[in-house]
């Protein structure tokens, strides 16, 4: 018999042996991974033994108790039953501690822990490593670089731009309101806040609301990316970037990222083209203060280098999203709160009419002269905080004021929604009571956190408050807001606070 014939008869046996070896290796790796997950679960159980929680499934965690669209309601049940904080198991080997006590908030926000990778890193393909995702010295450099873009001298002329954008929205709503049918207002408010941020921070010319096709595509992309990010956090099989890219959700996320980036790239290129026009560059350089995008374009890092294109777009993507979606959430929920509490709406309207007189528009000087309206805005932000929660990962052990402690490596979620609805912090928390924010009223320094707190609080919080006041004031002097009793909004958590079924209101023209 030839050698080749002998070799061919042995090949099946050799291949079978290879398969057996591969199967054994795979089984060994699987057992090692299972042992690793088991040991991590045991470590987490010991680390969190001071923090009781409802029983969890060894594999599914608390996922069955936290359906994606009733998550906030489940958090409130924990707030009532477990003091200060409660663990939530995402799955068998991953959990985070939900905190909703002001002392716990103060402790965590006073630290410099990094963001929790299990949630925030999933945003990187979309918004890049801008101010939201950066850590350490690089974050500090970017924060210091961008702070001048929110100086008093910059914010003051923005009020006129805010007024223009709100008036365009109200003109559109007036035409739609003639049909005397309830309107879903969130999309209209989103287009208005997107136009505002593009005019104020990115030197955009024209009206996003009137030329809204591409802007609607961007807003739709933001909505999809927000939904997909939350779904990914909750799916153990989507933690791997490789597996996620292969999934239908991963492909949808990639396409939505492309749409969002096309929008921000267009904004950057338009501003660069404007700066090439004769005299424009010198005009900008003579400004005492630069707006947000110009700060980025003219920025010099500490080593003398300009901001890279990648870093520039990350900051633009971050602020384009945060600068419009959070304020859209805030304004929409404020409108709903006032619609369902007509006595407070009426008192706000009287205050604003007394301030503005007949036909006058709102200016910078008016913003600090509407105390009751400001109280109502803050109470609505308490009930409906635009950002329901923020997360971090402990970089060192921590001991809380009640004596309980945690080791390094635990993920912390600060539930701002839970804090704002905590009856031990806010008596009768579901009651809309603007007097909580009356001048001179006392409360814990970390009981009210609509813009987070600590060194990483919202850099644009004053910009946002100004926009909320302008939108509320101009809307109330033009319309009476009425609820749609057949469609009560259901708060759900995405990246910002949304409504599962939209926010529907009837607008009745005044005069």
From Swiss-Prot:
Q: Where does heme bind?
A: 322, 458
Q: Which SUPFAM superfamilies match?
A: Cytochrome P450 (SSF48264)
Protein name as it appears in the record: Cytochrome P450 4A7
Pfam families recorded: p450 (PF00067)
- Keyword NADP listed? The answer is yes
Cystine crosslinks: none
Q: What InterPro entries is this protein classified in?
A: Cyt_P450, Cyt_P450_CS, Cyt_P450_E_grp-I, Cyt_P450_sf, Cytochrome_P450_Monoox
Propeptide position ranges: 1-4
One annotated GO biological process: lipid metabolic process
| Induction details | P450 can be induced to high levels in liver and other tissues by various foreign compounds, including drugs, pesticides, and carcinogens.
One of the record's GO cellular component terms: endoplasmic reticulum membrane
Q: What is its EC number?
A: 1.14.14.80
Give the location in the cell: Endoplasmic reticulum membrane; Microsome membrane
Task: Tell me which family the UniProt entry assigns to this protein.
Answer: Belongs to the cytochrome P450 family.
Q: In which tissues is it expressed?
A: Liver, kidney, small intestine.
Q: Which organism is it from?
A: Oryctolagus cuniculus
Q: What does the function comment of this entry state?
A: Cytochromes P450 are a group of heme-thiolate monooxygenases. In liver microsomes, this enzyme is involved in an NADPH-dependent electron transport pathway. It oxidizes a variety of structurally unrelated compounds, including steroids, fatty acids, and xenobiotics. The kidney P-450 system is rather specialized for the omega-hydroxylation of fatty acids. Both P450-KA1 and P450-KA2 catalyze the omega- and (omega-1)-hydroxylation of various fatty acids with no drug-metabolizing activity, and hydroxylate prostaglandin A1 and A2 solely at the omega-position.
GO molecular function terms listed in the Swiss-Prot or TrEMBL record: heme binding; iron ion binding; long-chain fatty acid omega-hydroxylase activity
Q: Which controlled-vocabulary keywords does the entry list?
A: Endoplasmic reticulum, Heme, Iron, Membrane, Metal-binding, Microsome, Monooxygenase, NADP, Oxidoreductase
């Amino acid at each position: 018999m030839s050698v080749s014939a002998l070799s061919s008869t042995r090949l099946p046996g050799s291949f079978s042996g290879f398969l057996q070896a591969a199967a054994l290796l795979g089984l060994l790796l699987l057992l090692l991974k299972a042992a690793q997950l088991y040991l991590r679960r045991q470590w987490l159980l010991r680390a969190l033994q001071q923090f009781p929680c409802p029983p969890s499934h060894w594999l599914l965690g608390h996922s069955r108790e936290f359906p994606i669209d009733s998550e906030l309601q489940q958090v409130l049940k924990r707030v009532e039953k477990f003091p200060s904080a409660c663990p939530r198991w995402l799955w068998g080997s991953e959990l985070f501690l939900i905190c909703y006590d002001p002392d716990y908030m103060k402790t965590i926000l006073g630290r410099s822990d990094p963001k929790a990778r299990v949630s925030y890193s999933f945003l990187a393909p979309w918004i890049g490593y801008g101010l939201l995702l950066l850590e350490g010295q690089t974050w500090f450099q970017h924060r210091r670089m961008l702070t001048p873009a929110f100086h008093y001298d910059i914010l003051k002329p923005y009020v006129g731009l805010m007024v223009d954008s709100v008036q365009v929205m109200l003109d559109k709503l007036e035409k739609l309101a003639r049909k005397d049918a309830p309107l879903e207002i969130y999309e209209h408010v989103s287009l208005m806040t997107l136009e505002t941020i593009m005019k104020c921070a990115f030197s955009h010319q024209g009206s996003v609301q009137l030329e809204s096709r591409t802007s609607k595509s961007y807003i739709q992309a933001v909505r999809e990316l927000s939904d997909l990010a939350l779904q990914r956090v909750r799916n153990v099989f989507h933690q791997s970037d490789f597996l996620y890219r292969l999934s239908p959700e991963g492909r949808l996320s990639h396409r939505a990222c492309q749409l969002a980036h096309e929008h921000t790239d267009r904004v950057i290129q338009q501003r660069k083209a404007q700066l090439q026009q004769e005299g424009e560059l010198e005009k900008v350089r003579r400004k005492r203060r630069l707006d947000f995008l110009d700060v980025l374009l003219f920025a010099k890092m500490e080593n003398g280098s300009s901001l890279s294109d990648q870093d520039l777009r990350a900051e633009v993507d971050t602020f384009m999203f945060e600068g419009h979606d959070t304020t859209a959430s805030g304004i929409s929920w404020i409108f709903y709160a006032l619609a369902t509490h007509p006595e407070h709406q009426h008192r706000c309207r009287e205050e604003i009419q007394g301030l503005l007189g007949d036909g006058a528009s709102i200016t910078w000087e008016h913003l600090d002269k509407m105390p009751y309206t400001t109280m109502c805005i803050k109470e609505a932000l308490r009930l409906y905080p635009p950002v329901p929660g923020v997360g971090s990962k402990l970089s060192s052990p921590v001991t809380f004021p009640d004596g309980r402690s945690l080791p390094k490596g635990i993920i912390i979620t600060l539930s701002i929604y839970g804090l704002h609805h905590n009856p031990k912090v806010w008596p009768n928390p579901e009651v809309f009571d603007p007097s909580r924010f009356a001048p001179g009223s006392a409360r814990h320094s970390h009981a009210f956190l609509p813009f987070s707190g600590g060194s990483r609080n919202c850099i644009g919080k004053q910009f946002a408050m100004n926009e909320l006041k302008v939108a509320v004031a101009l809307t109330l002097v033009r319309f009476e807001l009425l609820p749609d009793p057949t469609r009560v909004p259901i708060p759900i958590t995405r990246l910002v606070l949304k409504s599962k079924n939209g926010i529907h209101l009837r607008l009745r023209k005044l005069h």
